[in-house]
């Protein structure tokens, strides 16, 4: 009887210790908030890379993004589904940290190194990394290696900007593809549909980025309506006649809508 009691006591102690270890290490909620490691890449005052895995191209350095962008580790990039999402980041792990929050948009992928070894990792642009620092201490923060931050998912807000559709350089009437840029709110999309002139809405395929495409068996003619469904809240908006009948590859077309 005594040995049985000791066995159950040890079992209970083991279960408690397991629970304690789990709680100590559980510092993330990928969909919401937690702590993460942060590094930076590219030029000290730059936008990380010109373009990146999400397909935004040179737009990352220009308004309304202003180079306040980041590559996401696997959990945040999420096979491209994280493109366009926004995160508030507060630096906590270095004396040069200002403690003031910044907001960045995920525009690129960081697949290796510390990005892959941590549950959540944020690889900031040089400009965004400097924005985490106290005045005059940006270089100290950039030279610190991996620092710790608090992060949380934030609503994207591009004031005075509506959604833009930038046609892919290889797009044609049989293969229509474009990047969707500057979505307010969730920042990501769960569904994109295109409606050609005189036709019905056709679901498009996300290309592990902010690029969406449709391969049609026949030529699609514009003008095109585009119906967008946001990723988290599933709000739906329609950009009517946003891509004209005489559209051209590598051109951008600005809508009059946003979430």
UniProtKB/Swiss-Prot annotation:
Its main location: secreted. Belongs to the expansin family. Expansin B subfamily. This is Expansin-B4. Keywords: Cell wall, Cell wall biogenesis/degradation, Disulfide bond, Glycoprotein, Membrane, Secreted, Signal. Residues 51-161 form the Expansin-like EG45 domain. The keyword Transmembrane helix does not apply. Transmembrane segments: none annotated. Residues 174-255 form the Expansin-like CBD domain. Glycans are attached at residue 25. GO terms for biological process: anatomical structure morphogenesis; plant-type cell wall loosening; sexual reproduction. It is found in: Secreted, Cell wall; Membrane. One of its GO terms (cellular component) is membrane. The gene is EXPB4. The keyword Transcription regulation does not apply. Pfam families: DPBB_1 (PF03330), Expansin_C (PF01357). Residues 1-23 form the signal peptide. It is a peripheral membrane protein. Disulfide bonds join 54-83, 86-156, 91-97. May cause loosening and extension of plant cell walls by disrupting non-covalent bonding between cellulose microfibrils and matrix glucans. No enzymatic activity has been found.
């Amino acid at each position: 009887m005594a040995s049985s009691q000791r066995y159950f006591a040890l079992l209970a102690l083991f279960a408690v210790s397991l629970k304690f270890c789990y709680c100590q290490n559980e510092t993330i909620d990928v969909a919401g908030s937690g702590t993460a490691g942060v590094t930076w890449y590219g030029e000290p005052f730059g936008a990380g890379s010109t373009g990146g895995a999400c397909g935004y191209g040179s737009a990352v350095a220009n308004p309304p993004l202003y180079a306040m962008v980041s590559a996401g580790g696997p959990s945040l990039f999420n096979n491209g589904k994280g493109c366009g999402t926004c995160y508030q980041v507060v630096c906590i792990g270095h004396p040069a940290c200002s403690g003031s929050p910044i907001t960045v948009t995920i525009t690129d992928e960081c697949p290796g190194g510390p990005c892959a070894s941590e549950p959540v990792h944020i690889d900031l642009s040089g400009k965004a990394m400097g924005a985490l620092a106290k005045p005059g201490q940006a270089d100290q923060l950039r030279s610190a290696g991996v620092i710790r931050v608090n992060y949380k998912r934030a609503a994207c807000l591009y004031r005075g900007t509506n959604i833009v559709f930038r046609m892919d350089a290889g797009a044609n009437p049989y293969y229509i593809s474009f990047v969707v840029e500057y979505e307010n709110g969730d920042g990501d999309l769960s569904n994109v549909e295109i409606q050609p002139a005189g036709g019905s809405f056709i679901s498009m395929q996300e290309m592990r980025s902010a690029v969406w495409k449709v391969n049609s068996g026949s030529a699609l003619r514009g003008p095109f309506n585009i119906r967008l469904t946001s990723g988290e809240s599933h709000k739906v908006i329609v950009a009517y006649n946003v891509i004209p009948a005489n559209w051209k590859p590598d051109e951008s077309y600005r809508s009059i809508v946003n979430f």
